[in-house]
């Protein structure tokens, strides 16, 4: 089990005074708590690429958010798939850029009479990590309807139901699920529709009007359980990685 965006101290087994995480606590009691375990990077995509490849950012090249993980790198999910595992990804991946900006999109502009490098020499690596095969998580394509699904196998995952972005701005496959459950989901999402709350001061944070039953995490739990149930019916003896 690898938890995404979870502070180490936001577990009751780590001493949090309010939060209760009984299931994770039971795993901790039966296993090992690593108190000096460090992420490979401070940025999201860099750490995810390290988890997938077992390599440091200096080797896999994802040194910043907005840099796609190259398909040239072997992932542990590909190895599991090759060994006969059923593989599925439901939720956030962020192995490819999904925002509206980033190093691969925000290119250097020559000014004051400078000369830009010729095409093909603008990056340290000649083989591009953009274009075909690298737009699976690009949210503008999901919003416009240009993209309806992820190209599989996706870094080793045969079944993919994707979530992009964060909070109540999540898109991808989740957005279709949300639209099936509310006639006007955008009326509940975003800062303009947030519940007023003076406790929120960070510009990227607000109290969402989206009810818990429609949270992205609710979708992940529902669809994850559905996939597990289907797998148990269809291939009960096949190992899996979700």
Name these PLM-found stretches.
Residues 1-242:
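Formylglycine-dependent sulfatase
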């Amino acid at each position: 089990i690898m938890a995404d965006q979870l502070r180490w101290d936001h577990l009751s087994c780590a001493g949090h005074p309010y939060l209760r995480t009984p299931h994770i606590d039971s795993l901790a009691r039966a296993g090992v708590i690593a108190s000096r375990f460090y992420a490979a990077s401070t940025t999201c995509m860099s750490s995810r690429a390290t988890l997938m490849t077992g390599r440091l950012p200096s080797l896999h090249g994802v040194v910043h958010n907005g840099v796609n993980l190259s398909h040239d790198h072997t992932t542990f999910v590909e190895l599991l798939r090759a060994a006969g595992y059923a593989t599925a990804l439901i939720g956030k991946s962020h192995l490819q850029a999904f925002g509206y900006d980033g190093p691969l999109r925000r290119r250097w502009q020559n000014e004051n009479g400078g000369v830009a490098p010729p095409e093909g020499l603008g990056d340290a690596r000649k083989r591009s990590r953009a274009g075909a095969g690298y737009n699976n998580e690009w949210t503008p394509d999901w919003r416009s309807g240009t993209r309806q699904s992820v190209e599989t196998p996706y870094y080793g995952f045969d079944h993919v139901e994707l979530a992009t972005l964060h909070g109540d701005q999540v898109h991808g496959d989740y957005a279709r699920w949300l639209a099936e459950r509310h006639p006007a989901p955008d009326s509940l999402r975003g800062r303009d529709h947030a519940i007023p709350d003076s406790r929120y001061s960070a510009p990227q944070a607000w109290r969402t009007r989206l009810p818990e039953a429609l949270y992205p995490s609710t979708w992940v739990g529902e669809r994850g359980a559905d996939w597990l149930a289907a797998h148990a019916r269809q291939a009960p003896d096949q190992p899996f990685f979700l």
